[in-house]
């Protein structure tokens, strides 16, 4: 597949004429002009001088406006549409970067520099590697902007003379990575050739590694760590000489997936069993030596991260993190919360009837298999063997749960729910399903199309072990911990 942005066009885009055109296009979009009108404007077309530059500048302007919602330096950064879609939320990137404090860090699959900008604030020295040269060019520009704001050294044009070094190459072949702007091919024995010269700056042995591999297979996202690009088992094998690794994964990954527990690491990627320097590295640890952290931002489960070596939280096997959203508390009290599981999951809570309160546990804790621990601490029981829903008789106030008073438990039939609604004066209604194969919109029509909206009455259709019920809860009187 051809790159979204060629290196030649990227170099023009980061030049003063390219940046000025992106500023003009962004201002025109801000003023309400549409993309077609801008793209056919004679002065814009002349400034771009060719169709590829024009398309890149317009795409960068559109992406910049979208990036403003999350990125502090959006009005100076340069994105492609795809790169922006793939970029981590800056709040999450900053959380990840905390583990790399004052370290020499190699950021693989670095894209246009979103994660690297966060690492720039914590690392002592930073090396980035990106296979797509066009993206690497944008990354150097974006990191220069970030470095200026942070008042740290700016990315060097070649290796060896700056706090940040930007390289072009494959995450599984760091010996072949070349500094950005070096010639693509370097003769053996010359500076930058494999085995000598500046390329040694891109090694990962004894360093801390950060990598956010591609998680798309065709046009679909994958939860399977064996299908990422590069695959997780290949990354662990190739960089087993690293002091520690952080590999960003899809939020639905299983913490006990074989690729994360030592299986499938004999893939032939040219790595020695003990790393490039002969020392035992992250790939040689018993039981995989991996902590899988599930990160939730506000009410949304964002990602999982596999941590190895010195980056692992002691003996943690799985952990859950609640991050508050910058524009709202999101985690109950606006603070960061963490829970850690250091061994096998604890015993499941007993199954019981629907109590006075229905309790939902934060998705990050559920993925980390910590919901039963939370239930035990709060004195709650399960409603079904294969549901993470909990229940009890008192409203818990805990950052890891959302709890709602139960108003009624009735049959999960539209007629029964419609009859209950006729007998009770209620505000807006929200319909949610828990394991029940029902289309909420169809169910809403079948119960008489009551007013819809959040923070009112919730009709919770729950699949239990032997039947399904409709649990009517009062969201307005509930506790919203996350």
Report the location of each language-model feature.
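SAM-dependent transferase fold signal centered on methyltransferase-like domains
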Residues: 1-482
